[in-house]
Structure formats: C-alpha cells, structure tokens
Amino acid sequence: MKMKKQCATLTFFIGLHGYTIAEDNPKNISLSVITVPGHHERQPDRSIITQNEIDQKQSDNVADLVNTVPGVSMAGGFRPSGQTLNIRGMGDTEDIRVQVDGATKNFEKYQQGSLFIEPELLRRVSIDKGNHYPQYGNGGFAGTIKLETKNAKDFLQENQLLGGLLKYGYNTNNNQRTFSGAIFMQNDQKNIDALVYATVRRAHDYKRADKTPIKYSANNQANFLAKVNWWLTPSQLLAFSKVHGNHNGWEPFAAKRDLLPGPTEAEITKYGLDLAWKRKLVAREQQDRSYSLQYQFLPENNPWINTVAQLSHSSTYQHDTRSEQASKTYLASLGNESWTRYTDLTFDVNNTSLFNVAKTSHTLLVGLQWVKHKRQTLIFDPSKLQKAEYNHGYFQPSYMPSGHQYTHAFYAQDKIKIHNLTVSIGARYDYVKNIGKPNIATIYNDPTAGHDYSSKHYPGWSSYLGLNYKLTPYLNLFSNISNTWRAPVIDEQYETQYAKATLSPTASSLDLKKERITQLRVGKQIHFDHILSNNDQLSFNSTFFYYKGKDEIFKTRGVRCFESAQNNNNEVCSKKIGNYRNLPGYQIKGFELEANYDSTYWFTNLSYSHTIGKRLASPRNPWLASTSWIAEIPPRKAVVTLGSHIPDTNLTLGWKSEFVRRQDRSPTDQDKDAGHWALPKSSGYALHGIFATWQPKQIKHLRIQFTVDNLLNRSYRPYLSELAAGTGRNIKLSISKQF
C-alpha cells in the first residue's frame, strides 16, 4: 500500500500542472470532411483510435476495439450485443456518454450490452475520460466516447468523382465472414460529397481455448451507412449522417453472461435437443438507428462567429420472443415476449468567438441544448392472461418502467491564454424533468404501495476549471477540476414492486437526490520530434485522477432503514420505501502512463493503468461504519506493442501483448453479506497477438490485413465479464480493393 501511495504521489508531482477543459477544436466538425484521418490531437486525457488502428484490430464490436486503451475495459461476454464499457471503474450506462456522429446513444437493459455500432463503419474513435466538458451534462461521469463514421473524402483520390470499395474478411475462431461494399462520389465543384457503405457479418459460435463452443454466440447482422457533406458556400457546411444496424438470432436473454442453464436429459428426450435448448433462449430482433443533421457557419473574416447547430435522433429497439414450448414463468426476465425501445432526440446550438482583451486572447464558447429521452417497455406474461390486475398479461415490467426525461441546458466556457498559460473557466446549467408512465397493470399502479409516476424536477449548476501551462516546447502541464451532477434515470426513479412483495421495497423513488461528483486530474505531456532520425516522434503522457462522489444513486436491497441496520430485521421499516436510495458516496483514484515512439522503420507503444475505488459504506447497508471495495474496479493492466515499418514493400508488422493482474478485491471483504453486489475474484493472465498490413505496390489500392488474437491460445476469464470464458485463438484476414 505504501508503494502504491508513493506511485500516485510521484505521478501527481511529475506533472504539477495546468488544466484545460479538453474540448473539441471549435473549427472541427464531427461530420466534416476537413478532419485529417489519423490525426492525433494532443488534448489532455484524450485517447484517439485512428482509421489504421481500427482496420488493424478487425474487431467485431466497439467494446473490443477500445479494450486496450489505458483506463478503458470491456465488460460483458462475447455474444452479439453482450458488451458494455468501463472507464476508470465506472460502467453504468448513465456514466458513459456515447455519441455516433454527434447523436447520443442510450440503451440500458438487464444483462444486455449498450453498444451496437459496427466498427467497420468507423473512421475514428475518441475517448475523453472524466466529465470536464461543459458541453455535456447530466451524467457521463466516466467520460464520453465519440464514434465518427467514414466520409467519402476518406476514399476519394485527387480529382476522382466516383469510386467504389469491396472488402472481404474471415475469422477462423467462429468461421465469420464479413462482406463490405461502398460507393463514394463528389460533384465537379467538389463542394458536395456522398458515401454509401454496407457491411454484413455471418458467423457461427465462438470457441474457447479448449475448443468448446460458447453456445448461441453466432453473429448475424447487417449494417448500413449513408453520409452527405454539402458546402453551401465556402463558409457554410450542411452534413447528414444515417447509420442503421440490424441483428437477429436465437440467444440467451442475458447476452452478457457466459454459461447457460442447459436442458435436462428429460427435456431433451421430450422436446429433442434443438427445441430443448431453444426453450431456454429468446429469438431476438434488434434494430439500431442514428440520424444526425449538422449545420456550421464560419465566416472567413469574422472571428466572432463560428456557429454549429445539430439535430440528432437515435433509437435502439429489441423484440424478444420465447418458444411456444417455453415455460410460462419468466416474469423476472421480461416474460415470454417483450418490446423495448429507447430513443433520444437532441438539439444543440453553440457559437465560438475569438477575441483579445489587453494582453490576453479569449476563446468563448456559448451554447444551448435540449434533449428528449424516451423509454418504452412492454412484456407479455402468459401466466397472467386471466388476471385483470396484470392487464391480462400485457404490461410494463415493474423493474424496467417507461417514461420520459427532458433536459434543458445552457453552457459557457472561456479559454483565456496569457503567454504560455491557458486558463479555462466553464459553467453549465441543467434543468432535468423526469416523467413516469403509469403502469397499465393496476398491481404496479397502486398508491397504497407507494407507486407514484408523477414528474420530478432536478435543476442545478456544474462548474469547470482548468489550467494548461506549456513549460517548454516539449513539455505541457495540465490540471482540471470539475463539479458536476446527474439526475436519476427513469428506471431509478420509477421502479416498483407489488404491494405484497417481501424481498424488495415496493415504492417508486421520488425522494432521490441528485448524485454529485468532484473530479480532479493532473498530468503532463512530453513530445519530441527528430530524436534518432529526421522523421521520428517520441511522446510520454502521465495522468493522475481522483474522483469523489456523493449521494450515489443505488438500488435499495439488504438493510432498508436505520432501525434494521443492527439486526437485519426489515419488518421494522416503513412499507413505502423506494426501490432506489442515495448512498453516502465513493472515492476512485488512480493513474495512467503511456509512451509512444514512431519512426520510419519501427514503432512501439507502452501503457499502464491502475485504478482503485471504495464506497464510504456497504452497498447493502449505508449505515455500516466501514468502507467497501467497489466491485466494478478493473484490475491493473499493461499493454505493449512493438512493430516495424518496411517502406520498400509497404508492409507493417507488429506484436501486441496485454498483461492483466488478478482482481482480488471485493465488497465481501468488508461485508460478508454483500455477495449480490460483488463480482467473482479473478486470476491474472497475459494475451499475445500479432498483426500485419500489406499494401502491395504492384496492385494499386489493394490492402491486406492479417491479425491473430490470443496467439498462444490461452484460457482466460476477464474480471468484468463475471468470469465468462474468453475466446481462443482467432486468426483474422481481410482483403479490400478500392476502385
């Protein structure tokens, strides 16, 4: 422990720094064609995955794509739609903001994934860790992940008006075949360009290292992208993006889990093997949609005006149907048929002004934002067909209510530059309104049990302060501190149980307070050019972070009231206790180190991340006079990449190793009864892989990608997957030809 404290202290003082609110350059447009492919912005605490890195990884899903970024981990299993993300120990959907071409994505369903975008459609991924941006409010404590899809300009050659792309990929582990095609074009004036891109994946079950299949992990999905950029004038851009994704197949209801409760011998004899298994599964139909329309006005000679307005809409829909031969006792897992749809409608308009006052230069950002989030849920439970209080089987699940959340916001930030020092001061005001939708089943719409679907309002300010000091041309020091908050999501506010429930409280949770967090980060960035040759670069980044949360919104289970804290006798508590409550708080801290070297002939990358976190009480007992480990804290991780460029043959080769420590900290270490809130402790492991990219000079625009994951075929069980087995060796090959 002493050594850990020394490491954290050393990281703190190595970069006694300044803080910038690392925001997007106001001159950049998330959909614009003017963004340079592969450009690494030197923003504090921002990780960038470029087009080349996306192509080299050949990932099936976004969570796998970002899994080796320092401080970022994949959670969940390896089935389609079974992945979520974790950033610095925070993994709830409301903690991680995801945007696709500026369109906010939200999906939260028990034991389901939350990211469904196809990596093949992406050109760039940026990850901003922490919540240090006044453009974003009401949650997103862990950070923001921006997914930018491909542009026509990524493919068009100089003076080319029309072109196409064909691509084929194959994975050996699950016999996956990927087919992609694109058409891209621009007009003679080069002020309008358009792209249509489609990709299809067909795969069998994944296999573990011991060759056993991960049953019902087959992939069957199709994705489509359409994109248009239109420069109305040299200073006005109109950009449109449309992303569609479809997936269907038989799979477990809990897509994040690994092992399935298989059929018994008696069931196999009665139904046959195929039907006996499908009685345990759901036939899932999934649709994911994102639309974004953006307008930018940037007069060439007017530094006071750089206006961006964006309207976006996103939706995720899942329709699950169980076999007609399935049991009729699936109330706790969305019945025998369910319909779930999450939609987000967002409008944002902002302006950036550049001006000078005395000897200081200012970059002033002012914006307005409006968000409508809607959750629609419905299930069919055939066991309740004859019960009027359950609306004859059709109703909203009590643990996944329907409702709306509206957000109205104003934000502003001024970046003041004085010589080599930049001071960033920002503020944001959010007015959040939750509106529950009364359950159509009267058993879950009972005022005597505390069921209340009335609206709840949460107004409040967030503040941001940053310093950034360029000590030398090679050394940049930064520091940020922010105080932000979030309102309860619909599930947290309006989850209920029927009046006679004994294992859980019955009431909705209209007395919840806002969850607040103070986030601090300090670090340094070092960058050198021309170290060993004229074309090499060396960079080193270090960041220390500390988060202090207050009034954490958490499900009410275990000890329900102060009177029962000593003897666990909840009978003495009020009958109208909310299903969620505010816990005292938590602390998360850690550090990340990253070094990169790139030259004409070879390159390397080293990264290390370490996070620890504790709640100020037990998750089941807010009155326990002891801290407890946070279960979602990932184990320590180091990633090493070493490779070589061979310019004469346009060949790049590399080796990547990932070293993950065991995770042996659990809430049960302090509270033996907190097992429901714990993840199984895990062993450490090391994974190795190789990759190669070849663009033969003899065949123009031909590109061959070769990747091997888990080269040594190591058996492993990632901690955040709840010990779901990892996949065995996977050899990936893709060939693309541009015309």
From Swiss-Prot:
Bilayer disposition of the protein: Multi-pass membrane protein
Domain TBDR plug: 38-150
Any single Gene Ontology cellular-component annotation: cell outer membrane
Top-level taxon of the source organism: Bacteria
InterPro entries: Plug_dom, Plug_dom_sf, TonB-dep_rcpt-like, TonB-dep_rcpt_b-brl, TonB_haem/Hb_rcpt, TonB_Hb/transfer/lactofer_rcpt, TonB_rcpt_b-brl_sf
Signal peptide: 1-22
GO biological process: siderophore-dependent iron import into cell
Induction section of the entry: Expressed only under condition of low heme concentration.
Keywords, ordered alphabetically: Cell outer membrane, Membrane, Receptor, Signal, TonB box, Transmembrane, Transmembrane beta strand, Transport
Pfam families referenced in this protein's UniProt entry, alphabetically: Plug, TonB_dep_Rec_b-barrel
Keyword Nucleotide-binding: no
Coiled-coil blocks: none
Intracellular or extracellular location(s): Cell outer membrane
GO molecular-function term, one example from the UniProt record: heme transmembrane transporter activity
Residue intervals of the TBDR beta-barrel domain: 161-739
Function: Heme receptor.
Family the UniProt entry places it in: Belongs to the TonB-dependent receptor family.
Name of the protein: TonB-dependent heme receptor A
Lineage, opening ranks: Bacteria, Pseudomonadati, Pseudomonadota, Gammaproteobacteria, Pasteurellales
